[in-house]
Structure formats: structure tokens, C-alpha cells
A protein has these predicted regions:
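A glycine-rich helix->loop->beta "capping" turn
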Residues: 3-4, 53-56, 75-89, 95
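Conserved glycine-rich cofactor-binding loop
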Residues: 7, 12-16
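Aromatic pocket-lining residues of Rossmann-like dinucleotide-binding sites
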Residues: 25
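The beta1-alpha1 cofactor-binding region of Rossmann-like NAD(H)/NADP(H)-dependent oxidoreductases
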Residues: 40-41, 61-75
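Short, conserved SAM-binding/catalytic segment
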Residues: 46-54
Length: 95
């Protein structure tokens, strides 16, 4: 299934399952906006991998427990990439 021209938002997208979801969406043509809690190096590495697949991508730092951060995430997708077509709520707590 192709997602070309669609914009996906993935919470917790810089590592683990979230990263894998971001990469698969990008392989299928989706532009990807993802959130990350605090590991800037992991977020930057994921962003570069997504760009190498030829899609537009944005990494937005913030917690999904913070309504203002969630608004920023959604606003980034809509304002910078034009829409929000796919939402993957993946963020979790690593203990």
C-alpha cells in the first residue's frame, strides 16, 4: 500500500518500534513528523534516515503527557507539511 503524498505523525518515533514504524511509512512514501522525549542524537539519526528515503520529515521534542507539546506536534505536521493523514500513538515509558 502506498502512502505517497500523505503525512504521518508518530509519537515516540526516534527509537525502537516507533522508529521502525517511521521508516516503514517513509518507505511507502509518507512524509513523517515524529515526536521524541529527549534523546536528540537518536532523533537526529532517525530524521536523517527518513530524509535519505526521499520524504519530508520533522522531529519535534516533547512529551505526549503535555498538551502544549502535542499541539506543537500536530501544528508542525499541518503547517509545515500541509496535512495530517495518519496518526500512530506509539509513545511509552521505558523503565
Amino acid at each position: 500500500m502506498s502512502f505517497t503524498g500523505r503525512t504521518a505523525v508518530v509519537t515516540g518515533g526516534s527509537r525502537g518500534i516507533g522508529r521502525a514504524i517511521c521508516l516503514e511509512l517513509a518507505r511507502r512514501g509518507a512524509n513523517v513528523v515524529f515526536s521524541y522525549a529527549g534523546n536528540t542524537a537518536a532523533a537526529e539519526a532517525t530524521r536523517k534516515e527518513l530524509e535519505a528515503l526521499g520524504v519530508q520529515t520533522r522531529a519535534v521534542q516533547g512529551s505526549v503527557a503535555d498538551p502544549a507539546a502535542v499541539k506543537t506536534l500536530i501544528d508542525t505536521a499541518v503547517k509545515e507539511l500541509g496535512s495530517l493523514d495518519i496518526l500512530v500513538n506509539n509513545a511509552g515509558i521505558t523503565r
